[in-house]
């Protein structure tokens, strides 16, 4: 019977066998008592090779009965049982180990695998066990097929391999590298040529100079390798001697100011031999740049003890607190944002309309956004008690980030940028204009922002309005403690700018002043903690004092910033001559990122305008192509409006380029429309959406109400209470560590609950929220 079931099974190279596709059940068990049965197991479908727990096998069968030609009823059930640990000094070491790579080793060393081949006959019907691991009469053919499934790489393993590995590419200097002539004198590989350091040594591949590197995390360095490049700017490539091995090395290009690699190791090996180094015989004996970066990120720890050194009270996963989210390597930014939304940082934010039941027409839920939200919310809100050690949001992260270059990577990201990305994604997927009456929870944080522009010569004014999700508050450029209320006041006082007045017909100065046209249910404040030091963007840790950190009843009052709008009794509007100018509001998160990279405000706005206000990366690429433009850093004025093209028109050259790759014409056209004509992103979209039919729904004719901007927020003011704070430690928002504090009732008392990845504790200290607060959530009372 087993042979007949397995005969036509084709085993893929990678099998999803780490957790259930509908929940977070895994096959892993602690050591078992004698004759005890494992508590946890997964059933690998022999048709689609997806894993389901015992609870959800009937659901998968119903789904395949509804959506597939055949019912998926045959499964390989596996359970992994941990072997009793042997005493080992390293295992007993309490110091936290940093896992830099996932070494491809068998689980046979740590776990015993129990398996059985089973046929499920329907709900409430006993399953048929066709064969099991203890059987002695199973044929070699069937056993070979089962072993192939068990030995196949797991999807989790494939993801982990890249968790801490930097994505390093070649550069023009490695691609065009010419092997140098052998130096006349023997190179001393044991000491810096400019000082007495014997570690952190870098070899110039062009001449053999040995220079020490930069000082890094407790490692001495005087940057003599960099000094050598500055004196010899045609010598950009240097390799770290202590990192050399047959499989890895640290190579830095000073011209590109980035890590790099050779297209292959042939040129590298030949160059090293010139200096008497055989890379095949080398064993790395110093930390690599990857290790140093990971160690630095891991060192950004948040206090888990109070001021007296006592550990914070640990909280168990429950419906009140939810459950923890395990860090996937660099996913703490995602964990903090999700906890903020789901666990009360934005009160009443909910996706309850999705329900808790999975749709029957989705066979592969890992790639379906609705299914991933249902899976996540079921664990965090409906049954968190099942996951006392937290859950891994692996498939959730992959699903939401699959079409975004940054959020699909394993690099650390800016939590504020991710929050806005997530809200936009939910809008597009669940709350588009065609949605019928579903309240959008994202509107809880939205409001209308007013910009009042008054000419300092003629005194006439212009008002403009824009829907907004957060306010980014500039801080003073110092290291002193600052009062957030003073910074908010300074922000709403506005600034003096230059502009061409439509009434005065000349370039003049004007006062540009923001104000609230309406107020949100939850107000998000994002202090700008980035400033330039010696043209290098540095994240600050100014201590901020603000309402609500200590006393819940200490409210934020923003009523004085609620604008009354245009007053015809005391104000005169500017003429409408400037209406031929397009209204453009740049994405503030992208502006902050570009400024962090060292670009000016004017250049950043200009770049975002010319790239469709898409994202910082597109704008950055545009800036690199226009660095020589004489007006790049001049104040930016949007050009006059031109008749808009049909949004469904595409550039024929771009379309032809994609069609030459053999791609479906309808998909190509749709991809170019969705990606604003970007060919690279469009090609990626096509490959990620091969099951799309390439058609657009018929455009709706908007009625008068729909043509008006949706009313957002409240027209009257009320006090705001602080409900959550996302904190960040690190030198940049793209490194370090994120956590979130959410105010909750703990034993009938309001306390701050710290969500630090999978750890949940009641925290009494507010120091981290003062010095490291990055996103503050204030909710209307």
From Swiss-Prot:
* UBA domain span: 576-626, 649-689
Pfam families in alphabetical order: UBA_7, UCH, zf-UBP, zf-UBP_var
Which biological processes are named by the entry's GO terms? negative regulation of gluconeogenesis; proteasome-mediated ubiquitin-dependent protein catabolic process; protein deubiquitination; regulation of protein stability
The catalytic residues are: 332, 737
Q: Where in the cell is it found?
A: Cytoplasm; Nucleus
Amino acids binding Zn(2+) 2: 192, 195, 212, 224
Name any GO cellular component annotation.
nucleus
Enzyme class (EC, first level):
hydrolase
GO terms, molecular function? cysteine-type deubiquitinase activity; zinc ion binding
Source domain of life is Eukaryota
Coarsely, its chief localization is: cytoplasm
Catalytic activity, EC:
3.4.19.12
Keywords assigned: Cytoplasm, Hydrolase, Metal-binding, Nucleus, Protease, Repeat, Thiol protease, Ubl conjugation pathway, Zinc, Zinc-finger
Family membership noted in the UniProt record: Belongs to the peptidase C19 family.
Q: What name has this protein been given in UniProt?
A: Ubiquitin carboxyl-terminal hydrolase 14
Name of the gene:
UBP14
């Amino acid at each position: 019977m087993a042979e007949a079931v397995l005969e036509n099974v084709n085993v893929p190279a990678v099998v999803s066998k780490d957790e259930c596709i509908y929940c977070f059940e895994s096959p892993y068990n602690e050591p078992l008592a004698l004759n005890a049965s494992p508590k946890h197991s997964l059933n690998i479908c022999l048709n689609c090779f997806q894993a389901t727990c015992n609870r959800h096998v009937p659901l998968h069968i119903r789904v395949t009965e509804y959506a597939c030609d055949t019912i998926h009823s045959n499964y390989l059930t596996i359970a992994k049982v941990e072997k009793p640990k042997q005493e080992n000094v390293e295992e007993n070491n309490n110091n936290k180990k940093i896992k830099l790579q996932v070494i491809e080793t068998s689980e046979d060393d740590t776990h015993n695998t129990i398996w059985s081949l089973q046929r499920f006959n329907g709900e409430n019907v006993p399953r048929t066990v066709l064969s099991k691991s203890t059987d002695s009469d199973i044929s070699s053919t069937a056993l070979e097929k089962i072993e192939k499934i068990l030995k196949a790489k797991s999807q989790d393993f494939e993801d982990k391999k890249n968790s801490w590995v930097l994505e390093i590419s070649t550069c023009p200097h490695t691609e065009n590298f010419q092997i140098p002539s052998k130096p006349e004198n023997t190179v001393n590989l044991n000491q810096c040529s400019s000082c007495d350091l014997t570690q952190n040594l870098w070899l110039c591949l062009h001449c053999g100079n040995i220079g020490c590197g930069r000082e890094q995390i407790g490692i001495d360095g005087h940057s003599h390798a960099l000094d050598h490049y500055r004196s010899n700017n045609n010598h950009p490539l240097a390799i770290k001697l202590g990192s050399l091995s047959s499989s890895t090395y640290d190579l830095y290009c000073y011209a590109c100011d980035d890590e790099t690699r050779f297209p292959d190791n042939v040129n590298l090996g030949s160059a090293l031999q010139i200096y008497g180094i055989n890379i095949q015989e080398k064993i790395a004996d110093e930390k690599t740049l990857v290790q140093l970066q990971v160690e630095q990120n891991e060192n950004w720890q948040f206090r888990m003890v109070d001021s007296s050194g006592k550990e914070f009270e640990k909280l168990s996963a429950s419906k009140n607190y939810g459950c923890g989210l395990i860090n996937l390597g660099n996913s703490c930014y995602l964990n903090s944002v999700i906890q903020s939304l789901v666990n009360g940082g934005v009160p009443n934010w909910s996706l309850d309309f999705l329900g808790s039941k999975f749709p029957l027409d989705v066979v592969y839920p890992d790639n379906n956004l609705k299914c991933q939200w249902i899976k996540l919310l079921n664990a965090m809100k409906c049954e968190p008690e099942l996951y006392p050690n937290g859950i891994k949001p692996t498939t959730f992260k992959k699903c939401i980030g699959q079409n975004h270059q940054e959020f699909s990577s394993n690099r650390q990201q800016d939590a504020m940028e991710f929050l806005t990305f997530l809200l936009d994604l939910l809008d597009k997927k669940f709350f588009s204009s065609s949605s019928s009456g579903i309240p959008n929870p994202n509107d809880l944080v939205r409001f209308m922002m007013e910009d009042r522009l008054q000419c300092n010569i003629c005194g006439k004014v212009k008002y403009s309005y824009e829907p907004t999700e957060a306010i980014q508050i500039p801080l003073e450029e110092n290291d002193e403690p600052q009062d957030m209320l003073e910074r908010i006041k300074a922000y709403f006082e506005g600034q003096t700018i230059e502009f061409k007045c439509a009434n005065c017909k000349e370039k003049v100065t004007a006062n540009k002043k923001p104000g609230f046209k309406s107020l949100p249910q939850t107000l998000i404040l994002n202090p700008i903690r980035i400033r330039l030091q010696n043209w290098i963007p540095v994240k600050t840790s100014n201590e901020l004092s603000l309402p609500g950190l200590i006393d819940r009843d200490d409210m934020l009052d923003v009523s004085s910033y609620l604008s009354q709008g245009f007053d015809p009794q005391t104000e005169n509007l500017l003429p409408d001559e400037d209406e031929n100018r397009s209204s453009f509001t740049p994405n503030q998160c992208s502006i902050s990122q570009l400024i962090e990279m060292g670009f000016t405000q004017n250049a950043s706005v200009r770049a975002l305008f010319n790239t469709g206000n898409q994202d910082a990366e597109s704008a950055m690429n545009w800036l690199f192509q226009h660095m020589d433009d004489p007006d790049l850093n001049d104040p930016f004025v949007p050009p006059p409006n031109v008749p808009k093209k049909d949004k469904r028109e595409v550039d024929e050259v771009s379309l032809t380029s994609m069609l030459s790759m053999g791609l479906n014409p309808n998909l190509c056209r749709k991809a170019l429309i969705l990606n604003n004509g970007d060919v690279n992103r469009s090609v990626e979209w096509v490959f990620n959406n091969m099951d799309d039919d390439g058609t657009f729904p018929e455009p709706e004719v908007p009625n008068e109400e729909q043509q008006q901007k949706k009313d957002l927020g409240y027209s009257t003011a009320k006090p705001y209470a602080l409900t959550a704070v996302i904190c960040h430690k690190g030198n940049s928002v793209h490194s370090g560590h994120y956590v979130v504090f959410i105010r909750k009732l703990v034993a009938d008392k309001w306390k701050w609950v710290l969500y630090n990845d999978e750890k949940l504790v009641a925290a009494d200290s507010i120091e981290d929220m003062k010095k490291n607060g990055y996103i503050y959530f204030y909710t209307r009372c």
